[in-house]
Amino acid sequence: MNSVKRYLWFSQASLIICLLICYLMLPSVMDHNGGASNFGDGFPTVIPYALGFALSAVLLWVAASKLSQMEQKIRKTAALVTTIGVLDLLVLLTTFDRKANHVYYLVHDYLGAALFAYEFALSVWIVYKTKSYATGLFLLVGSIGSLLGLLSLVGPLRLLFAGQMIGGIGFGLVLTVGFPSVIAALG
């Protein structure tokens, strides 16, 4: 169980740290209300951007592999973690072609929306299962970040990347703190 928890932490930390490195390399993304995907557009930020998403996906799959080796009730949760990794990888892969034409752009945006929706739904489920004040607070943080991102897309705010980061940190905390509690309750 400890190895699953460790891989979940590393998956979320690698993504957040790599995106923060991207921001330090190219802070102007915030000036143009750009999202994290803009870091995948060119050198030098494409390297930590791709590394962050790829590492996150691989580490999530390792955690899922460990879950799939546990008792039957726990094994079923491996698919929940695998799905996040698949969506992370698809968002990464569609980043590079999104400016080629409108179809690629839409595919990337819809996959990003699917990742957000899945992470939000999973977070709500984890909070419901744990009934923990801490995971509820982390869900609130993620929701505030997501709201900032949404208002940046449709309104006057220019905080898309900040909203994505706050939302991602909130989800990462729900996943790394709450999900192991759900697994422990099943075992």
Regions found by a protein language model. Name each.
Residues 1-73:
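N-terminal topogenic module of multi-pass integral membrane proteins
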Residues 1-4, 65-78, 128-136, 186-187:
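Membrane-interface helix-boundary motifs at transmembrane edges
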Residues 67-90, 154-155:
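Cytoplasmic juxtamembrane regions at transmembrane-helix boundaries
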Residues 128-187:
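Terminal transmembrane helical module of multi-pass membrane proteins
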Residues 41, 101-113, 159-168:
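Non-cytosolic membrane-interface motifs at loop->transmembrane helix junctions
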Residues 82-136:
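Membrane-proximal helix-loop-helix units in multi-pass membrane proteins
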Residues 13-19, 48-63, 114-125, 168-182:
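Hydrophobic cores of alpha-helical transmembrane segments in multi-pass inner/ER membrane proteins
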Residues 68, 93-102, 149-158:
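Juxtamembrane "helix-exit" motif on the non-cytosolic side of transmembrane helices
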